[in-house]
Amino acid sequence: MPHVPHDAPHDAPHDVSRDASHDAPPAAALAAQAASILVRRPDRPVLVLQQVAEDGPAFLATWLQAQGVAMDLRCAEAGDTLPADLRDHAALALLGGWWSANDDRAWLRAAETLVRQAVAQVVPTVGHCLGAQLMARALGGTVGASPRPEVGWQRWQVADSATARRWFGAAPPERVFHWHGESFSLPAGAQLLASTAACPHQAFALGPHLAMQFHVELDAAKLQVWAADRSPEYLDLLAQHPDSVHDSMAMWADASAALPAQQALAAHLYTRWLAGCR
């Protein structure tokens, strides 16, 4: 994700509710599949780890609230602390951020400890971008530079497997949203679920746990902030990698169809995630 200043100017958002016909069939199919799965409402809150201010839970928070599921949000940049264990939480979610998973930060190492506890105790865990990289590191994988950075709506290839269909549905959308320059190797025992032309490891599953390099939690408000990025780092990436790094106009133009479809995907996989709660 971009390192967006808190006072960054916002571009006028495109109306993503219009012109959504391109990805409408996958979105409708995923919505129907999600509706057919009984959402488990755990009696304990979901622990959500937010690393930086610009990368909040967005659609994840909206979806949890709509399902009546309590969320315990802890943000590193806000000065929050992490619990020592997961006994008071039914599930774990890790968000993204502009930090590297390899940074020497006590918060990141504590987050990895919680991931290992979650796997050992079968507490279902979902990771987004940096959160997925932390999951990979915690479980024995490595994180390093991606073959090419990815920014914007990218086409992806979903594995032809029962596990991939379980998480992403029988008709996943054509594109998902990315903002990353690093990626992960697969931990031992993990199953690769998706890839892109620029990054072969996009998602993996390990039992009831899912790690994704992309941002299914994106909503229009978050996209508005991210698409306003004019940092030298982003502009350099845009100039050097025009095939895999998109500008703000492309992000908004593609969002008309891609964002509703991705949110249907998110609802589906979040439902599967909570289905693993004990």
Predicted regions and their residues:
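N-terminal beta1-alpha1 cap of cysteine-dependent amidohydrolase-like domains
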Residues: 1-5, 19, 25-123, 240-278
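Short, hinge-like loop/turn segments at secondary-structure boundaries
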Residues: 65, 89-93, 142-146, 162-163, ...
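Catalytic nucleophile loop
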Residues: 117-142
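Pocket-forming structural segment of enzyme catalytic cores
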Residues: 139-225
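C-terminal helical/coil "lid" or tail adjacent to the Rossmann-like core of SAM-dependent
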Residues: 207, 216-255
